[in-house]
């Protein structure tokens, strides 16, 4: 089972690696807020909520990051701020937040699995595919277990964190 898990995880990480350009662009967008006078507001959904404190309060949190909890908080965001929305899937709630951000002309990044039903991800300017749409490890009864959303997000997060750290270092050298 461990070999299958390892092989499947490597496949997910390879799919994420193929999005490196999108991840770099998303990191640059978020860094515009962190390096300027703005903040990075982070809204997580469903099981990804467990990762929110890490992104905003840990020793390796995104710079100038804050948790975003309610839609009415969007009115406090200005043009110097950016928003990061992270969910396992495109839910009605995530789509509602996307609509509100678009209505308010706020720059944002979305990390989630592709929206196979409605193709919402195709209309986004800054989108990173989580690449974990289903469980990956087969069992003896032919079902599958382990849907590694958090592992995939952690991998994407650390790529973004490293990119943003490098940008900070480059800016400090100038």
What are these regions (language model features)?
Residues 1, 18, 22, 148, ...:
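Catalytic cores of large soluble enzymes that bind and process phosphate-bearing ligands
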Residues 1-17:
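Generic N-terminal amphipathic, Lys/Arg-enriched alpha-helix
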Residues 18-35:
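A short, well-structured juxtamembrane/interface segment
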Residues 23, 170-174:
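Flexible, glycine/charged-enriched surface loops at secondary-structure junctions
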Residues 38-39, 44-170:
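Glycine-rich phosphate-binding loops that contact phosphosugars or nucleotide phosphates
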């Amino acid at each position: 089972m461990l070999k299958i898990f390892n092989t499947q995880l490597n496949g997910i990480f390879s799919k994420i690696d193929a999005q490196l350009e999108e991840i770099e662009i998303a990191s640059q967008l978020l860094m515009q807020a962190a390096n300027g006078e703005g903040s990075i507001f982070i809204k997580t959904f469903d099981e990804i909520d467990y990762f929110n404190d890490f992104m905003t309060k840990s020793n390796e949190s995104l710079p100038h990051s804050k948790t975003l909890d309610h839609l009415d908080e969007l009115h406090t965001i200005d043009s110097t701020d950016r928003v990061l929305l992270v969910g396992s899937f495109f839910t009605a709630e995530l789509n509602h937040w996307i609509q509100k951000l678009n209505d308010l002309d706020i720059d944002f990044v979305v990390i989630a699995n592709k929206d196979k039903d409605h193709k919402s991800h195709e209309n986004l300017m800054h989108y990173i595919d989580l690449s974990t749409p289903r469980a990956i490890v087969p069992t003896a009864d032919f079902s599958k277990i382990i849907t590694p959303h958090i592992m995939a997000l952690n991998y994407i997060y650390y790529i973004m964190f490293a990119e943003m750290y490098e940008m900070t270092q480059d800016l400090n050298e100038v």
